Regions:
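N-terminal loops that bind phosphate or other acidic moieties
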Residues: 1-167
Length: 167
């Protein structure tokens, strides 16, 4: 099955699925986190952040890109916990700035949104460190830009972008 674009209703479902997916990997992320500080709560903080956003996104009855973008950005910021949660909220903030005025999202707009998300998150961190969530986001954004000229299938595109972040 090919998917050429994502509308607001599908984006709403995707955000909710992503929140459940992150929650399922919370403990694994907690164990994975050892740099820059092995605090063991990165997965928990990111989960609390995305769940706050997901609650706001789920409450939207007739979704538009603008309403999803607003709920995702504001919900994640208000629910941000710890450094990783704040960075995640800034990734969402940048992503939503890029998509909020769209009727649908294509691989090109996703690549632009991932790039803007990464730029926004880097700017929000006073002293960004490589080897953190920022590095993963940057690698995924770069992969997205490369792929945007190679495929127009959103599923294929996202599968490859996610694989890039899973190194």
């Amino acid at each position: 099955m090919e998917l050429k674009s994502v509308d607001a209703a599908l984006l709403q479902k995707a955000v909710l699925a992503a929140a459940k997916g992150l929650e399922a990997k919370k403990e694994w992320i907690n164990e994975l986190n050892v740099f820059p500080v092995p605090d063991g709560d990165t997965g928990t903080n990111m989960t609390m952040t995305i769940m706050a956003a997901a609650r706001e996104v789920a409450a939207i009855e007739n979704p538009t890109m603008e309403s999803i973008a607003k709920a995702l950005s504001s919900g994640s910021l208000r629910g941000a916990r710890g450094n990783s949660g704040v960075i995640l909220s800034q990734l969402f903030r940048g992503f939503t700035k890029e998509i909020k005025e769209s009727n649908e999202i294509t691989v090109t707009s996703l690549a632009n949104a991932f790039t803007r998300a990464t730029e926004t998150a880097y700017k929000a961190v006073m002293k960004p460190k490589e080897g953190t969530i920022l590095t993963v986001a940057k690698g995924m954004a770069e992969k997205a830009v490369d792929l945007a000229t190679q495929t127009d299938d959103v599923i294929d595109f996202l599968t490859q972008v996610i694989e890039e972040g899973d190194y």
